[in-house]
Amino acid sequence: MLHLIASLKNLMMKNYHGLVLVLVIVLASGAAQEALGAAAVKQRTFSSPEEGVRALVDAAKSNDTKELLNILGPEAKSLIESGDPVSDRATRERFVTSYYEEANKLVKSGDSKMVLQTGKDDWPFPIPLVKENDRWRFDTSAGKEEIINRRIGRNELDVIQVCLAIVDAEREYYQRDPDGDSLLQYAQKFISTKGKRDGLYWETKPDEQPSPLGPLVARARGEGYKGAGGKPIPYHGYYYKLLTGQGKDASGGAYDYLVRGKMMGGFGMVAYPAQYGSSGIMTFIVNHDGVVYQKDLGAKTASVAQSMTKFNPDKTWTPVKQ
């Protein structure tokens, strides 16, 4: 349990440089996302780069998503969804408190371009300010690819740790026998049936031992936990699905993990991006041995991953360095 808690805590505390950029362009809720899609927005311009930066930081502080879109322009619409609104909100706050307020400066890059650098490491904000007709604006299109690449990199690093945390959770579940039937088995689902402990997560009272898995990870299961907007909620931009068997390319050969309806022979899992090319590229698989593999499943990632029932890391899957 301690390893699991530490793994998830580390995910929340990591300050990857690539995390910072998302804070100013992601939305806090599904309702805000719908509002942003309404009408074309004319981008705001500024009399100086300093004025532009102040406006950006003020909008981030106040979580004013409408003003952020005005500042960054219509190009920002396609960058708004990172796949995890909870993480996005925390990242946005961290940009202001841990980076901008720690240190900030504008660095000249040519006669008509300025780049905002923040934090003690002078992290460059990926969207530069450019001068046009004696006015300054954020050139979102110039930073678009970099933003997506950094988001994907951050998510994929986090998801590898989530995979290992789920392995820990399954092992703990097996040892604890939480359903009390005296049969040591792994959980077949992430969220328990109401009133039962047949999944990796269940609600507990303050004086009770926590369930092996936290609610945020559990609700990102592939079959689709429905949030307030009626859509599944990813965790670090990914969905997760448990597998009930393994194929011939897995260690030990092909066999089912289920024995008379109980998952006693092992467990497997697949993690795939909620939005291929935006929240992630790689799909990850892992089983009870704890070795994570990755593969780019291409444009049909979601349908391929959703149809998976067995853990089968053939030669097209690559082990992840852990």
Can you annotate each of these PLM segments?
Residues 1-15:
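N-terminal secretory signal peptides that target proteins for export/translocation
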Residues 20-30:
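Bacterial N-terminal signal peptides
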Residues 36-62, 143-168, 172:
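Short, low-complexity N-terminal intrinsically disordered segments enriched in polar/charged residues
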Residues 64-76, 185-187:
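Short, well-ordered alpha-helical segments enriched in acidic and aromatic residues
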Residues 76-125, 229, 233-234, 246-248, ...:
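Surface-exposed, charged secondary-structure patches
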Residues 113-157, 161-164, 291-295:
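Short beta-strand edge/turn micro-motifs at domain boundaries
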Residues 173-278:
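Flexible, glycine-rich surface segments
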Residues 265-322:
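C-terminal soluble interaction/assembly domains
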